[in-house]
């Protein structure tokens, strides 16, 4: 028997590929009989195929420990290594290596983390049993040495797999050959998939949290304020399940949320939230599209645009399955393309086809589980119902007007750079502005900040000498007065319409006695009840009385003094020229807007005029009547409160129409019915005490406030004695006959 020439304690051999394909699955080095006998002279032939014949292979400065077996069909000076071992050791065929006997120092492997993939990359196959594969690793490679990065092959269920050692932990601190350890039946094998692998296997690795969020984000840096609760809701519903490993979610039988709808008034930050969600997440940027941009003039192209948005998610899910990354698709102005099917008149059907295509892509026959579709709209009521069901856009988050704390956050965000540049004066108090700007949206608060800055800029500019402006950045200071002027300049869309209320009470309110005192106290009591009571979030009050007795003025005064953030008046004057349907829609919109504010007051003036009541016939609009009847009794959404104050001059008509039951109470607004009340009114209208006393002597029958004011003003236009003129006007208008 000829031996290869020894080099010290080792022999020099040339690397060759294994002759037998089955040798690739043993993770052993194969030696000629002569070389094996030289290194292991005392090993009996029945032990040739055990894993306890260890050799050390030196490749340059690197050393590798393997189990060895003899092969009689090899050249005398060669060593056979599998493709996996050659790739791991970075050696090629015919390269010379040094091999020596290795006396083991058994470092028992406590646990070994191994990644797995098909030997043929990109292959897909049936689901594999992880426990069966782990069992084969223990059986096939028991007593073999392993270390980090080592590659080896195994067979299971007629499939071949490549495995790579990701980590090795020993039970004891090794005395030599650190990083190497021997597999034993007690070794815990932790199996995981290689990156990009398509293998279908339930891994048993530690439950690692998916780091889908970046670690350094916060609301203020993102430019989002006042939406802490909304973000918590979004995180819980849409992202919490995605943090857990797919295997855990699959065990629970839970599907990820695939879509959410952000809705609310304009300017509240819906688009901003959706855009910033992409910055919160690790990985790819979201696709942001405007609803109208989906539509195309060519037949079928609109539907193709929808499919193209989901194409990347489809490809990755087919390639990676549950390990696919999250694809976010954001639709701005969703109501432009997803109106309820069948609601369009004279339509070509493209709109309905787009809705159908979107429904199929989100949750159709071949649904995707790696997408999150975010839609935004101001008109949730226009969206097709099928799109809002669970499995599609199932999470509905209302982005409402910010509260006081939220408004302060928004002010801080939009003045952050001013603070950094020391451009805010010391008297600026953002908390006060947040308290003042009730029902301002985020966009309107930004408008306030820009308006305040414009006042600061204007102080540095001489309008008479614009060409020679000397810019001194250090002199630009935004002060408290700038913000106060800006707040009066920028009015909220969902705020109080003070100008409208002032026109209803131009002459103010005259307290003419105990009767009016009681009436005013009752009205204020209802206001306080709505403010403080949690049991009555909705209160409807009817003010009834003769024309001109001051019902509208009293209703406007109660609404204005309530200091509710949202106050509106629905008056026949504002709906002049509208048809019945348009009037009903306008009335409904006012009430819908009121539900977006924490506390609201709506004044419905002259109900009989609104419903177009005419006694001849009689004739009235049943559509408007039923609209009012429903809205007067509808409970606002949770957390919202509404006070409705309506006025009428014909309560009997309303009773016949069965609308009186919609009101919690009816307050009668009386006319001036006593001489004492008449005297008080005259005094409040500018009479001297003597003139008021004399005028009261003319009083004989009830009269309304409006009539008294008209007569007083007419008397003042006449020449001569004012009291005589006043008496004459009373007689001319036959007021005594009332």
UniProtKB/Swiss-Prot annotation:
Signal peptide: none
Predominant location: membrane
GO cellular component: endosome membrane; Golgi stack; membrane
Enzyme Commission number(s) of this protein: 3.6.4.6
Superkingdom of this protein's organism: Eukaryota
Enzyme class: hydrolase
Cofactor note: Binds 1 Mg(2+) ion per subunit.
Classification via Pfam families: AAA, AAA_lid_3, CDC48_2
Protein residues bound to ATP: 507-512, 547-554
Family affiliation: Belongs to the AAA ATPase family.
Function, as annotated: Required for vesicle-mediated transport. Involved in endocytosis and endosome-endosome fusion. May be required for transport from the endoplasmic reticulum to the Golgi stack, and for the fusion of transport vesicles within the Golgi cisternae. Required for cell polarity, locomotion and chemotaxis.
Stated name of the protein: Vesicle-fusing ATPase
Species for this entry: Dictyostelium discoideum (Social amoeba)
Source lineage: Eukaryota, Amoebozoa, Evosea, Eumycetozoa, Dictyostelia
């Amino acid at each position: 028997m000829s031996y290869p020439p020894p080099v010290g304690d080792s022999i020099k051999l040339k690397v060759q590929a294994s002759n037998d394909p089955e040798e690739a699955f043993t993770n052993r080095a194969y030696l000629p009989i002569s070389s094996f006998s030289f290194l292991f002279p005392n090993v009996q032939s029945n032990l040739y195929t055990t894993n306890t014949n260890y050799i050390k292979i030196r490749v340059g400065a690197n050393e590798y420990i393997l189990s060895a077996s003899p092969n009689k069909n090899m050249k005398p000076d060669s060593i056979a290594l599998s493709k996996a071992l050659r790739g791991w050791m970075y050696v090629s065929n015919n390269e010379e290596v040094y091999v020596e006997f290795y006396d083991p120092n058994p470092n028992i492997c406590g646990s070994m983390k191994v990644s797995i993939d098909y030997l043929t990359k990109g292959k897909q196959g049936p689901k594999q049993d992880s426990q069966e594969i782990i069992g084969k690793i223990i059986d096939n490679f028991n007593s073999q040495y392993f270390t980090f990065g080592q590659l080896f092959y195994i067979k299971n269920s007629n499939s071949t797999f490549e495995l790579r050692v990701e980590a090795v932990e020993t039970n004891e601190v090794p005395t030599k050959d650190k990083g190497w350890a021997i597999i034993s039946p007690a070794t815990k094998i932790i199996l995981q998939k290689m990156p990009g692998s398509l293998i279908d296997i339930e891994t048993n690795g530690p439950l690692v949290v998916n780091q889908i969020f970046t670690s350094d984000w916060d609301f203020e840096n993102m430019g989002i304020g006042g939406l802490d609760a909304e973000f918590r809701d979004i995180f819980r519903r849409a992202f919490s399940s995605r943090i857990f490993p797919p295997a855990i979610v699959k065990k629970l039988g839970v599907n990820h949320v695939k879509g959410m709808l952000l809705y609310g008034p304009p300017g509240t930050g819906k688009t901003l939230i959706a855009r910033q969600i992409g910055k919160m997440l690790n990985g790819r940027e979201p696709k942001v599209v405007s609803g109208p941009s989906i539509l195309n003039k060519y037949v079928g192209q609109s539907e193709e645009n929808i499919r193209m948005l989901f194409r990347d998610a489809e490809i990755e899910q087919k390639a990676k399955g549950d390990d696919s990354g999250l694809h976010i698709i954001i639709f701005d102005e969703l109501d432009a393309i997803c109106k309820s099917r069948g609601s369009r008149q004279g339509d070509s059907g493209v709109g309905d086809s787009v809705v159908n295509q979107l429904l199929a892509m989100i949750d159709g026959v071949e649904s995707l589980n790696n997408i999150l579709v975010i839609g935004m709209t101001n008109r949730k009521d226009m969206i097709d119902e099928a799109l809002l069901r669970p499995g599609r856009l199932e999470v509905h988050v209302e982005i409402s007007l910010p509260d006081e704390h939220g408004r302060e956050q928004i002010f801080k965000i939009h003045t952050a750079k001013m603070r950094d540049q020391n451009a805010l004066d010391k008297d600026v108090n953002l908390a006060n502005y947040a308290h003042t700007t009730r029902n301002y949206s985020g966009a309107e608060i930004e408008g306030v900040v820009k308006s305040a800055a414009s006042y600061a800029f204007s102080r540095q500019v001489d309008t008479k000498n614009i060409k020679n402006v000397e810019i001194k950045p250090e002199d630009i200071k935004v002060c408290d007065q700038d913000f106060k002027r800006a707040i009066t300049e920028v009015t909220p869309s969902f705020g109080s319409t003070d100008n409208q209320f002032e026109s209803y009470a131009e002459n103010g309110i005259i307290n003419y006695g105990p009767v009016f005192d009681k009436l005013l106290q009752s009205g204020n009591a209802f206001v306080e009840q709505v403010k403080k009571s949690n049991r009555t979030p909705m209160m409807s009050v009817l003010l009834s009385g003769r024309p001109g007795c001051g019902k509208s003025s009293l209703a406007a005064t109660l609404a204005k003094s309530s200091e509710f953030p949202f106050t509106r008046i629905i008056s026949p004057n504002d709906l002049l020229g509208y048809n019945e349907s348009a009037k009903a829609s306008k009335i409904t919109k006012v009430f819908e807007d009121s539900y977006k504010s924490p506390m609201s007051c709506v004044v419905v003036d002259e109900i009989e005029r609104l419903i177009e009541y005419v006694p001849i016939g009689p004739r009235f609009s049943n559509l408007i009547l039923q609209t009012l009847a429903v809205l007067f009794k509808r409970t606002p959404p949770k957390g919202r409160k509404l006070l409705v104050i309506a006025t009428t001059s014909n309560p009997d008509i309303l009773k016949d129409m069965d609308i009186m039951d919609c009101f919690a109470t009816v307050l009668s607004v009386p006319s001036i019915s006593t001489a004492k009340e008449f005297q008080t009114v005259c005094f409040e209208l500018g009479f001297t005490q003597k003139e008021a006393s004399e005028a009261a002597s003319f009083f004989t029958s009830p009269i309304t406030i409006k009539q008294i004011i008209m007569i007083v003003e007419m008397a003042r236009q006449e020449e001569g004695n004012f009291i005589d003129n006043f008496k004459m006007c009373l007689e001319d208008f036959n007021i005594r006959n009332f």
